[in-house]
Amino acid sequence: MLKKIITALGMSGMLLASSNAIAEDTKTKNDNLSPQSVDLSPLRNLNKLDSPMDKDYNYHQAFKKLDTEQLKKDMQDLLTQSQDWWPADFGNYGPFFIRLSWHDAGTYRIYDGRGGANRGQQRFSPLNSWPDNVNLDKARQLLWPIKQKYGDAVSWSDLIVLAGTVSLESMGMKPIGFAFGREDDWQGDDTNWGLSPEEIMSSNVRDGKLAPAYAATQMGLIYVNPEGPDGKPDIKGAASEIRQAFRAMGMTDKETVALIAGGHTFGKTHGAVPEDKVKQAIGPAPDKAPIEQQGLGWHNSYGTGNGDDTMGSGLEGSWTSTPTFWNHDFLHNLYNLDWKKTLSPAGAHQWTPTNAKPENMVPDAHKLGVKHKPIMFTTDLALKEDDGFNKYTQEFYNNPEEFKEEFAKAWFKLTHRDMGPKSRYIGPWIPEQNFIWQDPVPAADYKQVSTQDIAQLEQDIINSGLTNQQLIKTAWDSASTYRKTDYRGGSNGARIALAPEKDWQMNEPAKLEVVLTKLKEIQTNFNNSKTDGTKVSLADLIVLGGNVGVEQAAKQAGYNIQMPFVPGRTDATQAQTDIESFNYLKTKSDGFINYTDGSISADKLPQTLVEKASMLDLNIPEMTVLVGGMRALDVNYDNSQEGVLTTTPGQLNNSFFVNLLDMSTQWKKSDKKDGEYIGIDRKTGKQKWTASPVDLIFGSNSELKAVAQVYAENGNEQKFVNDFAKAWHKVMMLGRFDVQQ
């Protein structure tokens, strides 16, 4: 049914394929690109160029002038100020705004941290026109007077999430808190969202199923088809798809049940247009709507086009008799009414009770005195029929207060998961409670090291017997887990010493243990020697060790540099580390150290390097200088010599670029190893070097070659070292929100 009409109003996360999955997916935008045509767009920060804000605009500073209590009051007043151009169901926009917030935050995917409410991407194409977001353009338009009033002091991305949170509270579901701090984008991002609506409707698509890397289970839907898999009312099949989709958002079964049951306590779904009139009555989505509609889409020519004639998902009705008040009637109806399969006016599969009593009847959303039977989706009934979900629906049904508490926690997680650690939160309503999904690190309860202490520790590291390569690679492996998409990972917390990171193949566990043991010994000796409360964390020592390695390698090449070091990192505990969640930070390839687990084809490795660099918030020159420096430093995974294009391995110099661009070398594919290239001396025919596709891309791709040439030029040797040091420090500081506010 939903392929004929506008796709359903799901209640969370159309997640995107992970960055590694994107590199492998045959449907990606880079599908037809050869390695030399690697897409560098992820490294271009066009949002800064497109921003209309002043260069010195700082959201955190602008927020300080916001009257949050007045903003909240204005939002509460708006909920019951029904507008003729889009009347509020039941006289309250609360359920509408909950859906707005949910669909905004629900795009988050745990695989690579993309999606979510941060940056306000729902305002832009393609999300603003995604079928599951039908009519949410009107919800954002309803918020415009408030945004206009408060201006730069509140971002769209904060306002959209706040709208749903205030709505919950106004309808009797007190949230556990709310954090401001989301900043706005100014253009739609170029993330691989899957297929276009046209492709979705194509008969050539494989039964509408999405590959496992996507959190949604059917194309065009935010998470699952509420009618059931492929529009078939298969309750058990629906349960499987719900679990797949919500786990891809990082939600447990308990959180999944709380969110669906709690969300469906409110509001209604819309399918008033008769099935045979849908195609003619409903206009195009916002990105294809006529210009005179001013960004509003899905124009409905049936009846009044709104109110009781509203067309959305195609399903029609409400779940409870009190759709603007929090209670556990959804669960009561789920267990106490007998549900029979039926069709909505628009022809969508849904369920209505055969034994509804007067107290179960639902008031009409717009006509006084008119009543309707409650409804359920196929996916709702799955919460009862599936054993795993049933455990929690029964538990919540019998314990209404627990249900309320678990929904509040799950809502906070849904709407804040993509914001990163708690140190990024701002505002007066931040809950005191910490959650493991926030990747907490303890606050420092000791005095930070002084400049003199740092000098002593550097000498201790030099005297430890650890090589520069050991120190550099350990620091890189620790810091390079960072993801700018959801602000997870990085050096803070020293989680490279904890499960699961300490056991990752790319971190070479046996070698890592040698380094960590020695650094812990230095840490213990130093901390025991101090009597003034000064301590150093392992996290800081790992980074300091990397700095020492870089400084020593530069010195060996004839350059004296002093790496900046900002102490303050603390060490997380194993209890503060969700092993399953952190495993999503594990990469399948890291081109900076020429690592791959073998699951990605060689021709896709240059693109995964770009994706990795993008996650580290690097630009093209920074990526380039880091790769060249890491090769010269000889810190490849497993001591591989691929790309170590230097006769002075371990010294920080520009040899990689000089030798890569040397025309006395001819490159050929190896006939012994897939993805390996052999550098042959043109005169003697003897082998000089080996390299990976990642290495050769810097001489093959025209843009990367232009940057590589700068670093290979005579007179730019010191520039190369300085630029490497700056880029290295940037990576080491990723995730240090405590000093970047």
Swiss-Prot record:
Q: Where is this cross-link: Tryptophyl-tyrosyl-methioninium (Tyr-Met) (with W-102)?
A: Y223-M249
Give the record's cofactor note, including how many are bound: Binds 1 heme b (iron(II)-protoporphyrin IX) group per dimer.
Named from the GO MF annotations, one term is: metal ion binding
Q: Where is the active site?
A: H103
Instruction: Provide the E.C. number(s) assigned to this enzyme.
Output: 1.11.1.21
Q: Give the position(s) of the covalent cross-link described as Tryptophyl-tyrosyl-methioninium (Trp-Tyr) (with M-249).
A: W102-Y223
Q: Does the keyword Transit peptide apply?
A: no
Q: Quick one: signal sequence residues?
A: 1-23
Catalytic activity reads:
H2O2 + AH2 = A + 2 H2O; 2 H2O2 = O2 + 2 H2O
Any single Gene Ontology cellular-component annotation:
cytosol
Q: Which UniProt keywords apply?
A: Heme, Hydrogen peroxide, Iron, Metal-binding, Oxidoreductase, Peroxidase, Signal
Amino-acid positions noted as binding heme b in the UniProt annotation, renumbered to this chain: H264
Database matches in Gene3D superfamilies: 1.10.520.10, Peroxidase, domain 2
Q: Which InterPro entries match?
A: Catalase_peroxidase (IPR000763), Haem_peroxidase (IPR002016), Haem_peroxidase_sf (IPR010255), Peroxidases_AS (IPR019794), Peroxidases_heam-ligand_BS (IPR019793)
List the cysteine pairs that form cystine. none
Known post-translational modifications?
Answer: Formation of the three residue Trp-Tyr-Met cross-link is important for the catalase, but not the peroxidase activity of the enzyme.
Gene Ontology BP term (one) = cellular response to hydrogen peroxide
Q: Identify the cofactor(s).
A: heme b
What the entry lists under Pfam families is as follows: peroxidase
Family that this chain belongs to: Belongs to the peroxidase family. Peroxidase/catalase subfamily.
Outline the subunit composition.
Homodimer or homotetramer.
Reported function: Bifunctional enzyme with both catalase and broad-spectrum peroxidase activity.
| Name of the featured protein | Catalase-peroxidase
Species whose genome carries this gene: Francisella tularensis subsp. holarctica (strain LVS)
Taxonomic lineage: Bacteria, Pseudomonadati, Pseudomonadota, Gammaproteobacteria, Thiotrichales
